[in-house]
């Protein structure tokens, strides 16, 4: 899917290739083989949908892993400086195939922004007019779902755990912001 995403905006940039290598943590002795697979995938006429369905089946019910895959795809799309509309559409379609709701997708997308640009309510899957109690419940739910220790206990790949740590930072930052906003 990373090959298809890299190609969807018309060209595969050097930055996107570096991002794929960085996020997938490819061992040095396998880079050539993975490169061949990547090149073949980006040139194939087959769309990304079969790959997305395959991943959705493999990780059926493991929302944490599926959300982290979306995070990794955003990381790759962002690596060349901007996320094109075609890249965004593709990532959104993959999220739908994974069974993620629009609220979950928007939360992931929002958490990709730098902390000073985050909308804390979107990150916490809530609205500004929700009570602090409702937002706190969502915060606790998201914290539990994305906690790196939980993912480690499930044996997920390290890159998924790393993305989970970044997501937790966004969740915690959003909660801090909401507490400040609601106390005023």
Spans of model-derived segments:
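Small-residue-enriched hydrophobic alpha-helices in membranes
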Residues: 1-7, 11-184
